[in-house]
Amino acid sequence: YDHWIARDLAAYLFLAENRDSDASLLRIVNKPKRYISKDLLAEAEQMPYGLLRSLHVCPSLQKWQAEHLESLEEDLRQIQKRKPYEALRYVRKVVGYDEYLSDYAVYRKASLSNMIEIADEITETAKGTESGTEFVRKMEELSRQMKEQSKQKGNTHGVTLTTFHGAKGLEFGAVFLPSLAEGIIPYEKGRKGSALEEERRLFYVGLTRTKDRLFLSFTENRYEKPLKPSRFLMEMGLDERLFFKENRRKF
């Protein structure tokens, strides 16, 4: 919950409720790209207003930059109308944060599926919260709890929630790999060439973290859309005949 993706998503919600939060604006102003330059931001910081308001009245503000700012303002209004879970989905799918992650992954040669996995986890965390402020507090509390748990010594019993990247070098008695469906692993944007190979390597990392037991599962639906089992399951020699359904539950 201290990951920069979590902080980005929280910043959108916090800014929607607190337009004077300069720190939140600076964090997301170009995520996705809005072409608000460092020079323009420096100019706005010299004005006696909040940063967002100041940007609108900067003498050097170009028309196309103003249009991006107006679009951001409208997005913030839409975010403010929604509860955190729906607001984060809006940020990711409508504002374009997931597309920003896709561009970032290409630029940094990073795993897009890992970043989407983190964004999905943060989005799920928002369920049950009523405001951006409550969501931010919930993340802060979860982060505090995880740090406290990591400090505890001598307790060998527990559950570790981690990403494929975070699991490298670790070993567990039992490993659960959920959501092994096309569009999740591999992620829909990373299905070709080196990106696909990177996702396959990460999947192998997950498989090999176990000493005794390995549990693989997939979800039939996501955001009300049907899904198919991951191709990586098929590559292991598994096929859909091994998935049985009884009373709408997978076994």
Roles of regions detected by a PLM:
Residues 34, 46, 93, 208-209:
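Solvent-exposed polar/charged
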Residues 20, 114-117, 172, 198-200, ...:
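A generic structural signal for residues located within well-ordered alpha-helices
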Residues 221-251:
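Helicase C-terminal subdomain and adjacent C-terminal extension
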Residues 22-45, 136-147, 237-245:
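Extended, charge-rich low-complexity interaction segments
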Residues 190-194:
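Short glycine-enriched, charge-decorated loop/helix-capping segments at active-site entrances
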Residues 134-187, 198, 202-222:
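Conserved helicase core region in the C-terminal RecA-like lobe
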Residues 60-166, 187, 244-246, 250:
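Accessory C-terminal helicase-associated subdomains
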Residues 1-84:
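ATPase/helicase motor core of nucleic-acid motors
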